[in-house]
Amino acid sequence: MDSLIVRPLNEDDYEQVLMEWWRQWGWRAPMRDFLPDNGKGGVMVLDGEVPVCAGFMYLTNSKVAWVDWIISNKEYTDRSGRKQAIKLLVDSLTNVCKKSGAKYAYALIKNESLIKTYEDVGYFKGDSYAHEMIKPL
């Protein structure tokens, strides 16, 4: 593992990187316009030149920011490196939210390993939920 680099998402990342990652994991990708800033409202962590993971943050009209849509490169096989990169990702997204004026960071996650990562950077479990409900308008 080289040094980890955090950079903002750019215009090309959704089509050229993230769509492939969602496909690798067998997940349905969110529509680009469902994501903050049309798919650019987040950051990516790279190991040198290799993209490892990315995530998004929604800033709201309250003091709450939503840190979510964490996705990683399934072909990046350094498990320890992936764990470190995802922790850096969640921490970086949370810090951007704080610098943007949010007082609380919120996330909806189901994956136990990811829940542990969020806890490692200071999140605590709230209520559990059964289903996400979305309605296109």
In which residue ranges do the predicted regions lie?
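Short amphipathic alpha-helix that is part of the acyltransferase structural core
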Residues: 1-31
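A short helix-loop-beta-strand connector motif used in the catalytic cores of GNAT acetyltransferases and
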Residues: 32-44, 53
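Conserved acetyl-CoA-binding loop-helix of GNAT-fold acetyltransferases
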Residues: 79-95
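Conserved beta-strand-loop-alpha-helix junction that forms the acyl-donor binding cleft
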Residues: 105-116
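Conserved catalytic-core motifs of GNAT/GCN5-like acyltransferases
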Residues: 108, 124-137
